[in-house]
């Protein structure tokens, strides 16, 4: 069975690297620059905010349709232009640390009726499941659409360990009390009959509701590759789902309100299933929702789904902090939210500008064209076609001058694209420019 080690991150991310060789070519007309922390951005942010009535006049086209020829390669712009807001705030943020208190506060909102608790994976039922799986062995794919279960390295040790744990298992819970330290690997029993398995570490936490300690989420794209569970062939589909995507989004938004989280928006919705990673049993079908930062109403985007591309300019390590994108995942079926996870939270410290002055969109278009021209002229790419699939005003992270611990969330124009030079035609990449000063934004940091 395909599965990740459970540190709150479910799913499989594939990174496709385009190898482009540098060639001696004429210098592009316009230099492509990143925010170098020289204070220029701060000066713009200190300017008087644009009055709200003027913000209404900021106009963008409904779509961008254009073909840009660059030698024998081309960039096809064929995308709607997303500008979901009419005012453009800038925020200052810092990373928020995970502690046991973080988990306790979230659990208090989700399960105020928590009564009992036990260490996850230690009940007789759970240990028997794991022992049966260890005796069965691992699944080995024969590459011909079949396969078999067989022994694996360390199998005998696992069987012996589980037999000893089973012999000493005590199926008793203790009165619930707030957790004192991380990591947390417990199952909480509630007065209303719910069972919530809690996993929490120093960079994430996850709650699984009424699905057991071994439940993992598998999205439709992962399942379709085959082998996600046992001998499932390529093209495997997730079965019927008794909830609509719209209902799933409503449930996710309600969960955000329950947890008291602001600034998160739904970035994607995908059919998914929850499976028992030990017994290889499908537990329920529903939808996986990815939620990302959308402070100020900016369009959310999931940088973890964007591949690494040589067309994307990365800031040197000396110029940046390796910020990790705050991200949440939820699984929703007809019973509601059954799984919720948070990774790498950030804290908004203040609003730097309530309505920053943006560059005209025509200027943004020229900057993005120049980005593509710059890369194609300095690389030996022949006959490539890049297709721009999405253009959106997002909130992106850029550093604060002379401060490694804080960053700004600024409006940035994100340009997602695919390329016919890679092995995965549906893999998306992205470039972005700061909508305030036109400098490059490294989207893999945002």
Region locations from a protein language model:
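Preferential activation on post-signal-peptide N-terminal prodomains/segments
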Residues: 24-320
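Segments that shape or occlude catalytic/ligand-binding pockets
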Residues: 248-424
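A short, surface-exposed interaction/processing loop segment used at functional sites
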Residues: 205-242, 323-358, 428-446
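N-terminal secretory signal peptides that target proteins for export/translocation
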Residues: 1-6
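Sec-dependent N-terminal signal peptides of Gram-positive bacterial secreted proteins and lipoproteins
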Residues: 7-28
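Activation/maturation switch segments at domain boundaries
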Residues: 29-41, 395-446
